[in-house]
Amino acid sequence: MSKPIQMERGVKYRDADKMALIPVKTVVTERQELLRKPEWMKIKLPADSTRIQGIKAAMRKNGLHSVCEEASCPNLSECFNHGTATFMILGAICTRRCPFCDVAHGRPVAPDANEPEKLAQTIADMGLRYVVITSVDRDDLRDGGAQHFADCIAAIRAKNPTIKIETLVPDFRGRMDRALEILTETPPDVFNHNLENVPRVYRQVRPGANYEWSLKLLERFKEAHPHIPTKSGLMVGLGETNAEIVEVMRDLRRHGVTMLTLGQYLQPSRHHLPVQRYVSPAEFDEMKEEAMAMGFTHAACGPFVRSSYHADLQAKGMEVK
């Protein structure tokens, strides 16, 4: 019997090293390896990368992280070129090891107590009017990182009084009561928590997470803050069916969620879960029609949509795909 891997604190485990730590193994078949991206999945890079390099430099200068870079988001060039970014707090090492995600796994260091102030100043320097704050999972913290979220929100608003803040939070596994109590003190303008996919594939796609728990988190926040929109998103192409996606949409509406994002899953590396199918733009349009008919006030559905992709436009109800 092989010895368990001894993880060093502060070390990022990625790709094969990360996947080796997952109890439900990822099996890539020859057919899946041959699945090629269709034409609609091709990305055009901007000719001028000056703004992109400027945002990266600002992040490095202040020791901040963006989920855009850490999760290898396909929209990084477009978003950075438009002067927008999704800030990732609580470090760049996640205590979970989801096989669809490119964020590093490991034993994270203690949260940076100066991060809220550095984040607030960076946002002020960039002149942003709408920001998305997300984080890695921090199962090592007694509140799951909720107090750090609250501190960041308070610091950002102190320096940027008119700004709109969207939080994309983890599930606060085992700590929901405490986390919601803390977030009640400084709630965001939009509360986002992603279900990621349908319950049938959770054991493989989101090991360590629970579908019903995530729905309950969204519902309880909405009950405490009925005036604040709640939002959730799914990746498609991981073995689910369109009928299952529609059922998840119904579950979200039953739990008070009014904003939805649906986007195509893309395999970050050959070590991650393979793409099972590519969903066409026409299918995404049909899903959006279904969502709006169910009563969602906002539904961004398209191949490149991510939960924070043009989040400011999503919040205004403008079409994003």
From Swiss-Prot:
Its EC number is 2.8.1.8. It catalyses: [[Fe-S] cluster scaffold protein carrying a second [4Fe-4S](2+) cluster] + N(6)-octanoyl-L-lysyl-[protein] + 2 oxidized [2Fe-2S]-[ferredoxin] + 2 S-adenosyl-L-methionine + 4 H(+) = [[Fe-S] cluster scaffold protein] + N(6)-[(R)-dihydrolipoyl]-L-lysyl-[protein] + 4 Fe(3+) + 2 hydrogen sulfide + 2 5'-deoxyadenosine + 2 L-methionine + 2 reduced [2Fe-2S]-[ferredoxin]. One of its GO terms (molecular function) is metal ion binding. Keywords: 4Fe-4S, Cytoplasm, Iron, Iron-sulfur, Metal-binding, S-adenosyl-L-methionine, Transferase. [4Fe-4S] cluster 2 binds at residues 94, 98, 101. The keyword DNA-binding does not apply. Pfam families: LIAS_N (PF16881), Radical_SAM (PF04055). Pathway: Protein modification; protein lipoylation via endogenous pathway; protein N(6)-(lipoyl)lysine from octanoyl-[acyl-carrier-protein]: step 2/2. It is found in: Cytoplasm. [4Fe-4S] cluster 1 binds at residues 68, 73, 79, 308. Belongs to the radical SAM superfamily. Lipoyl synthase family. NCBIfam families: lipA, PRK05481.1, PRK12928.1. This is Lipoyl synthase. It comes from Serratia proteamaculans (strain 568).
